[in-house]
Amino acid sequence: MFSHKFICGSLTKMTETGITFDPPVYEQRYCATIQILEDARWKDQIKKVVEFGCAEMRFFQLMRRIETIEHIGLVDIDKSLLMRNLTSVNPLVSDYIRSRASPLKVQILQGNVADSSEELRDTDAVIAIELIEHVYDDVLAKIPVNIFGFMQPKLVVFSTPNSDFNVIFTRFNPLLPNGFRHEDHKFEWSRDEFKNWCLGIVEKYPNYMFSLTGVGNPPKEYESVGPVSQIAIFVRKDMLEMQLVNPLVSKPNIDKESIPYKLIHTVEYPFYVDTRTEKEKLWTEVQIELQRFKRQFESSEIEEGTYQDTCNMPIAFLLDRLEHVGATKERIEELLLENNLTVENECVLIVSSDQESEWSDPYKFSDRSSQDDALVDQEQEEERWDQGPES
């Protein structure tokens, strides 16, 4: 086994009427899974991710923000559920205003987690959040074959309820008639049962190691029962700089009994590759700050009823604004002189709007403030995808 520690915290409260988790357990699972995907040991090598049991595609709204991921496959067996939610993967206006730095292709697929299909080839990471407890034994037996035998990903994450925790739930309400937390659950494993399932997988597929963790910590007086939701992280040994036991199969055969996946929807996100030199990028930032300073100066002149042909922007102020992009006083002064701007007494002389300037490009910046406003609006729209109640 290997180790993985989550940095996100949580608070569990138990009162006379019930138990509450802050943040909700589904948010903790999402947070934990994002942290796993972004682990520095393998993040840059995770380009294609497949999520089985994607349901309403809530987790996708977080996963799509990882810039290193370039292909996401969202798989569920329920076609009607996919059809109701397929538009939620489309780019927002903000995705066009602030494009990604790398491409992102998203595919919504109808299929069974137990079936191998062409769309699953070359997958780097597999995510299955609260899925395995919903399948019957015959499907459960085929899941490792499809994922570890056919797909051979670098990383796999499973989460499932921890039945040891149910003793706390039954203090307040009985479990459902099927004996579980959800009417569609076919089983709920204890921590030992889940561990044994994982051990069976690495015994059959020795190229992998696993680590067990979880989210939704119990109250202090019940620490022995473990977390409400348990998580297994499988990592291919070469991701941990270890020798593979068996060579990878270059092109594994698709199981003849597998039903091919059906493509429901495909979308490609806008992206922009910045080919400018570092010097060109810095000059753009300098121009933006000069324009901003000039607008503020002219606005104050209008309010005070005073007008001047030039305004002086201290280089120290400019440096303070641009230090985060690697600006230095020497680099800024060099750029200013190269672009025919006058520097006197540690200040840049900026001409007023009614005078011609060699560095001024009114069309380049005229829509900047309106774009910023639009970006704020769309970021608020994005947030609603992260806040829905758990189903």
UniProtKB/Swiss-Prot annotation:
Lineage top rank: taxon: Eukaryota
GO biological process, any: piRNA processing
Q: From start to end residue, where is composition biased (Acidic residues)?
A: 374-384
Alphabetically ordered keywords of this record: Magnesium, Metal-binding, Methyltransferase, RNA-binding, RNA-mediated gene silencing, S-adenosyl-L-methionine, Transferase
What one GO molecular function would you report for this record?
RNA binding
**Xref: InterPro entries:** Hen1, SAM-dependent_MTases_sf
Needs which cofactor? Mg(2+)
Known PANTHER family for this protein?
HEN1 (PTHR21404), SMALL RNA 2'-O-METHYLTRANSFERASE (PTHR21404:SF3)
Q: What function is annotated for this protein?
A: Methyltransferase that adds a 2'-O-methyl group at the 3'-end of selected small RNAs. Mediates 2'-O-methylation of piRNAs, single-stranded siRNAs and long hairpin RNA genes (hpRNAs). Methylation protects the 3'-end of small RNAs from tailing and trimming and could constitute a recognition signal for appropriate argonaute machineries.
This chain's protein is named Small RNA 2'-O-methyltransferase
Q: Which organism is it from?
A: Drosophila melanogaster (Fruit fly)
